[in-house]
A protein has these predicted regions:
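Conserved alpha-helical scaffold segments that buttress catalytic/binding sites
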Residues: 1-148
Length: 148
C-alpha cells in the first residue's frame, strides 16, 4: 500500500513517514479510495490494513455504475474543507486506456470515459486544491498517440 508511509503504518519507511511537517501526514479519515476493487487489486495485508484502520472505500462497481454519484459519495465521506485528488492510472481498464504502468488490468476497471465523469465532478468542487497522477506510463501506448 503506497499510502502506508503517509499513514505511518507499521513497516513504513521512517525516512518517508518523517518527511513532512507532521507525522503521520494523513489520518485514515483523510482518505477515501474511489474505484478500487479490493478483491482484485490489493494484497491480503492491504485489505487488512484498510479494514483495521477503517479506510473508506467507494468501490469499483459503484464508480462504474454511477461515476458522478460515486464521486459525490467519496466527497461526502471526507470532512468539509480542502482536499486533493490522486489518480492512480492502474485502476483503468488497460485495453481502453493503455497508459498504466501496471498492465495487469486488462478488461477490468473503469474506462477513461467513466473516470472522466468522476474526475469532472471532483475537480469542479471549489474545495479541491489539486490533482496528482501516478502510475502513468506513456510508453505503453506509444503506438496510439491519442491514448494520453
Amino acid at each position: 500500500m503506497g499510502m502506508a508511509h503517509a499513514l505511518g503504518l507499521e513497516g513504513a519507511a521512517p525516512e518517508l513517514v518523517d518527511l513532512m511537517y507532521r507525522t503521520p501526514l494523513l489520518q485514515p479519515s483523510d482518505l477515501v479510495y474511489l474505484g478500487v476493487d479490493l478483491s482484485r487489486e490489493t494484497t491480503d495485508w492491504e485489505r487488512g490494513q484498510a479494514a483495521e484502520h477503517r479506510i473508506a472505500v467507494v468501490d469499483q462497481t459503484a464508480l462504474c455504475d454511477d461515476p458522478r454519484g460515486a464521486a459525490a459519495d467519496a466527497r461526502r465521506i471526507l470532512a468539509s474543507g480542502p482536499f486533493l485528488v490522486h489518480l492512480d492510472v492502474d485502476v483503468l481498464d488497460f485495453l481502453d486506456a493503455p497508459i498504466a504502468e501496471n498492465v495487469n488490468g486488462r478488461n477490468s476497471g473503469p474506462t477513461i470515459a467513466i473516470l472522466g465523469q468522476a474526475l469532472g465532478a471532483l475537480l469542479q468542487d471549489p474545495d479541491r486544491w489539486g490533482l496528482s497522477i501516478g502510475q502513468l506510463d506513456p510508453a505503453h501506448a506509444s503506438a496510439d498517440r491519442t491514448a494520453i
